[in-house]
């Protein structure tokens, strides 16, 4: 021991201060780390499986925490409308649902007297709601666009009451989750009928004034950001323009090429102007002269009908729903 101490003193004081190199211990994978890796792997496999084969949609009523009566009550409160609960429940019952449930009871061998369900179809409410909606929308649009012809008003009403727009509104109002239908997801035609049945229930519950407000808030707003001829499909805009100018005792328009660019390239651009009595009434672009002329005719029609891009927004602050609703209910 003494000899080792003497040898250490001979090496100097630096050796005493030298740090001892730690031993490198190979990492050991613990049970917890292995479990986490396996859990992440299984989770990724499940995610990829759901992406490849997504599960079929499930009715909300087949999931836990569902109370149909409470959901019906909450529907009216959510929309801030006063519905009669019996009418609202009837509005969500479709004839296809009644037939399918009665067929299931027959397959179970239930007697014929007990097979019939004590439910009423929403057919009558849907017809009332459809008729009132079309009449009310016609009154709204005629008041807002007095220069638009009857054909244009009818096309706008058909667009707003069409399957695509109505189903979009109905899904965002959770009408689909409350609809009693044979199939799920609910077919567009059935969903459209159910939405108009809800309008019919509101008409009988709260009167035409509140129903007109409902139609204004949820259907008229679907015109926001839409161009006139997206909703009204016309084949011959120049012919329609000539007819409209003739009604106003204005001479037929003359088309002239005003500007062009890249005529010899793959992407040419032409601007055609329409002149009446030597005055430019509209100008439109297009990849050919004919397309530019048709676009100029559409621009002129928008100006005539008051449906330009910079038109005044719809006035929601001071509606005249009382007068319009009275007209609608009288006409329907």
Curated annotation (Swiss-Prot):
Residues covered by the DRBM domain: 236-306
Compartment list: Mitochondrion
Keyword tags: Disease variant, Endonuclease, Hydrolase, Mitochondrion, Nuclease, Primary mitochondrial disease, Ribonucleoprotein, Ribosomal protein, RNA-binding, Transit peptide
Domain RNase III: 86-228
InterPro entries, sorted: dsRBD_dom (IPR014720), Ribosomal_mL44_DSRM_metazoa (IPR044444), RM44_endonuclase (IPR055189), RNase_III_sf (IPR036389)
Example GO BP: mitochondrial translation
Disease: Combined oxidative phosphorylation deficiency 16: An autosomal recessive, mitochondrial disorder characterized by hypertrophic cardiomyopathy, liver steatosis, and decreased levels of mitochondrial complexes I and IV in heart and skeletal muscle.
Chain's role: Component of the 39S subunit of mitochondrial ribosome. May have a function in the assembly/stability of nascent mitochondrial polypeptides exiting the ribosome.
PANTHER family per record: LARGE RIBOSOMAL SUBUNIT PROTEIN ML44, RIBONUCLEASE III
Similarity comment: family membership: Belongs to the ribonuclease III family. Mitochondrion-specific ribosomal protein mL44 subfamily.
Name listed for the protein in its UniProt record: Large ribosomal subunit protein mL44
Recorded name of the encoding gene: MRPL44
């Amino acid at each position: 021991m003494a000899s080792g101490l003497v040898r250490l003193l001979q090496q100097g004081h630096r050796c005493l201060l030298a740090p001892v190199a730690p031993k490198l211990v190979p990492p050991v994978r613990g049970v917890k780390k292995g479990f986490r890796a396996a859990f992440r792997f299984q989770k990724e496999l499940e995610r990829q499986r759901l992406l490849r084969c997504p599960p079929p949609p499930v009715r909300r009523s087949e999931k836990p925490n569902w109370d149909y009566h409470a959901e019906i009550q909450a529907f009216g409160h959510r929309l801030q409308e006063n519905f009669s609960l019996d009418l609202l429940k009837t509005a969500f019952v479709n004839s296809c649902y009644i037939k399918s449930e009665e067929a299931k009871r027959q397959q179970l061998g239930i007697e014929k007297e007990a097979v019939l369900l004590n439910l009423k179809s929403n057919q009558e409410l849907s017809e009332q709601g459809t008729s009132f909606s079309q009449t009310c929308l016609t009154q709204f649009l005629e008041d807002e666009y007095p220069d638009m012809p009857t054909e244009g008003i009818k096309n706008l009403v058909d667009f707003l009451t069409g399957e695509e727009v109505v189903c979009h509104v109905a899904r965002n109002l959770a009408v689909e989750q409350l609809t009693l239908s044979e199939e799920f997801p609910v077919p567009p035609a059935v969903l459209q009928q159910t939405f108009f049945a809800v309008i019919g229930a509101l008409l009988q519950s709260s009167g035409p004034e509140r129903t007109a407000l409902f139609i204004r808030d949820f259907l008229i707003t679907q015109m926001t950001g839409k161009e006139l001829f997206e909703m009204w499909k016309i084949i011959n805009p120049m012919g329609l323009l000539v007819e409209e100018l003739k009604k106003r005792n204005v001479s037929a328009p003359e088309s002239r090429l005003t500007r062009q660019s890249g005529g010899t390239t793959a992407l040419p651009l032409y601007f055609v102007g329409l002149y009446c009595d030597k005055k430019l009434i509209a100008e439109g672009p297009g990849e050919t002269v004919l397309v530019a002329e048709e676009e100029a005719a559409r621009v002129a029609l928008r100006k005539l009908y008051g449906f330009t891009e910079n038109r005044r927004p719809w006035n929601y602050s001071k509606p005249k729903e009382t007068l319009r609703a009275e007209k609608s209910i009288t006409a329907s």
